[in-house]
Amino acid sequence: MAAAAGAVVASAASGPAEGKKITELRVIDLRSELKRRNLDINGVKTVLVSRLKQAIEEEGGDPDNIELTVSTDTPNKKPTKGKGKKQEADELSGDASVEDDSFVKDCELENQETHDQDGNEELKDLEEFGENEEEIVHSQELLSTEENKTTQEFVEAEAIEDREKEDIESQETEAQEGEDDTFLTAQDGEEEENEKDIAGSGDGTQEVSKPLPSEGSLAEADHTAHEEMEANATGKEAEDDNISVTIQAEDAITLDFDGDDLLETGKNVKITDSEASKPKDVQDAIAQSPEKEAKDYEMNPNHKDGKKEDSVKGEPVEKEARESAKKAESGDKEKDTLKKGPSSTGASGQAKSSSKESKDSKTSSKDDKGSTGSAGGSSGSSTKNIWVSGLSSNTKAADLKNLFGKYGKVLSAKVVTNARSPGAKCYGIVTMSSSTEVSRCVAHLHRTELHGQLISVEKVKGDPSKKEMKKENDEKSSSRSAGDKKNASDRSAKTQASIKKEEKRSSEKSEKKESKDTKKIEKDEKNDDGPSGQTSESLKKSEEKKRISSKSPGHMVILNQTKGDHCRPSRRGRYEKGHGRSKEKERASLDKKRDKDYRRKEILPFEKMKEQRLREHLVRFERLKQAVEFRRRKEIAERERRERERIRIIREREERERLQRERERLEIERQKLERERMERERLERERIRIEQERRREAERIAREREELRRQQQQLRYEQEKRNSLKRPRDVDHRRDDPYWSENKKLSLDTEARFGHGSDYRQQSRFLDFSHRERARFPDTASVQSSFERRERFVGQSEGKKPRPAARREEPSFERYPKNFSDSRRNEPPPPRNELRETDRREVRGERDERRTVILHDRPEVAHPRHPRETVPNPSRPTSWKSEANMSTEKRESRVERPERSGREVSGHTVRGAPPGNRSSASGYGTREGERGVIADRGSGTQHYPEERHVVERHGRDTSGPRKEWHGPPSQGPSYHDTRRMGDGRAGAGMITQHSSTASPVNRIVQMSGNSLPRGSSSGFKPFKSGPPRRF
């Protein structure tokens, strides 16, 4: 391994380009290639390999093979970071030739990681070693300009280192006594450091493992570790104590890095050659001691006096350290990949990258020197300590004792863990009885499984404390190598933030710290090596480390992390003195190469790189600040927008509610108006209906009134017309009637006054009637007296009896017989009609033979008549006797009249009879020929169902005065008036004072002459068996 690495380094030194398979590249090489192509460098190795292959394919190259340009100036300066300050001193001597290319790449990766860590570490170092700062810087300048100056700086560094050793020795004892306190302090520091790392700008660097956050506690832990290591360097007794102290310091660092960082920080802290002898530095020394040794060899040419010796001594140690580092890296990579080993994302990545670079570019020379130095130390000291990493949290010391007891005698076993963070990785230190057993245990138990976890078993080379520290460093380096795989992704998460912070601080402080650390390392080496050559080498290494650290904040971070590494280099130097001489030859051969590399190296570019890193860090910080401000503004704007949106939504909701309320109000108003409108319409309809009803009622009333008026007018018209027809007819008959006598006229005079109200004015017309005029009618003179007597008697008897009005209102079918035979009633008293028709005939036949009744002419009449009316007026007897007989008979018949409806019958008959018949029935003689004429002239065969006949008056004006009806004041007119008088008294008949003079015939005429309806104002009243009523 070492030879191959040496060959690789040699080829790299000789040729700028080196062909390798991508799969064989270290993570740091992969990242450097990716960064050179401006690609993402975060992720595990597999991701980086695939990314790089893709980039190469895009470029048109071979994705499987790649040519790496390895400049001799790219020393494993990153490994110095992971290794620690003392180891950096070694690397400065050994890595000078190889630093340029790989270091540039490493620096770029470390820029993000180291600034923050270096800042805190530098602050501590400045406080602790402020007085050495100027000397260290001066020594760096001397190294870069003149070798003499370098020697002077070395002397100064020795003086400073002596003083520091004294301080460390005093503190070492306290640290041993207060291991627990230191451990707790480291834990506290770790928590604070984690917080700071989290708060950091996250550059992606891997040196988060520095105990920067807790500057106080971590500084104390680091100081204690450094002092312990330096004390251990002065004496082996202190070495044992320093082992525990170193473990504690490592644990503190590890605590800072959540367990995974323990390994990385330890590795980073223990990378220097002198650190290889120290417990913490052992791991880093194993991984990076070749670089430091190579740097030492490069320094040796400058200080050939004692540097060669130191390099000779350091070579075997460095070889062993290199081999162990390779083993640890390979084993830890596997272990960490499987386990996610304890290597911290930050420091492990840096240590790993630095160790890988040192291995790849100058691993051959560095590993040779590192193996000669560290391995030489381990062989010289016959390493009996074993460093076990990757233990599960439930592993106990007894478990380790049992496990390692299978391969030899176990003197002691110790388990270290981080109590602050649950689930953190545990580490073990096992002390075997002999180095052969150690080798056996490493051979059999490395990369085996214990309690379900893959453990890594490494030797601790050098003094017991140095061996343990070396084991830790180896394990850390291995964990770094394995952690590089893991931390490729972890770096982007944890270490980036912390490293950004640290970069700021460490950029300036790293130079001072590294210078101090290098001085300490040089002192330790001088003390350990004794020969001035070794001290000069350590001085050169320390100075070179200072330069490297100043150039690369990553290295500074490593030195800062392991302040106790200053002691470790001294121990390592002592260890190299004892065991490094065996490898002086190898170192001598490598010195030349390193000298070339160192010559090629340029120190100024590191300064520039440091400034560039600082600027980049500032830019990143500014960018981060801008991003935070932008995010804050964005959040504020978002909040304002949400608030505006909320207000808008609230307003919209309120507006909707207001509109809804308004709509509801309008709806209610509309409904109200609708109800009012409907009510108005209903009232209007009601009003219209009432008006229509009223109008209809008014029309109905108007129609009824009109009808009534029309009926009355018609009635009046009919009556007047009938009267107008009757008067001329009656007048004419009277004039020609031989049977009319004064008696009849007298009797009619009394009735004429009451027949028509309009004729009452003519009452006096008949009062002056002289009975002497009767002489003109000698035939009727005797009859007149008898008639008067009978009429007088009858008028008294009938006039007293009021005629009931009900009889007149009987229906027409009762008062108007259908035939003559039916109208006769078979009551005990013979009907009046029969009496009148038979008796009258007999009487008349007896009294007057002159009058013959012609019965055969009756059928010619159009209207049926009552049998009484059909009988012609019998010849009036001239004798009193006959007259008396007839009057007696009539009186008898009239007395019986109320008992039957003869009155109504006769009335009906009279009414139903046509006017022609009426005239004949009146007893005006045998004027049947004229009767027909009158009937024809009158209403002509027309009957009136209303029980009245409208008599048309030909050539007569109804409106004319009534006196026109009466004609001249003679018997005719007087008789006519008397005859009509009874009709005017139909409703309330009266017997006039002349009723006694009325003859039976005249009475009959009066009865039968009433053709007008009852209650009428004109016409004859119906025949009744009694005289007309008296008013």
From Swiss-Prot:
It is found in: Nucleus. Residues 384-462 form the RRM domain. One of its GO terms (biological process) is apoptotic process. It comes from the Eukaryota. Residues 102-127, 220-229, 270-283, 290-339, 354-370, 458-529, 538-547, 563-598, 717-739, 787-869, 888-906, 944-966 have a biased composition (Basic and acidic residues). Gene3D superfamilies: 3.30.70.330, SAP domain. GO terms for cellular component: nuclear body. The modification N6-acetyllysine is found at K401, K1021. There is a cross-link at K500, K881, K1021, K1024 (Glycyl lysine isopeptide (Lys-Gly) (interchain with G-Cter in SUMO2)). Keywords: Acetylation, Apoptosis, Coiled coil, Isopeptide bond, Methylation, Nucleus, Phosphoprotein, Repressor, RNA-binding, Transcription, Transcription regulation, Ubl conjugation. Residues 1-15, 1015-1031 have a biased composition (Low complexity). Residues 342-351, 872-887, 992-1014 have a biased composition (Polar residues). Pfam families: RRM_1, SAP. The modification Phosphoserine is found at residues 93, 97, 139, 144, 289, 421, 549-550, 552, 747, 786, 797, 812, 906, 920, 995, 999, 1011, 1016, 1018. The modification Omega-N-methylarginine is found at R1014. Residues 107-182, 608-727 form a coiled coil. When overexpressed, acts as a general inhibitor of transcription that eventually leads to apoptosis. This is SAFB-like transcription modulator. It comes from Mus musculus (Mouse).
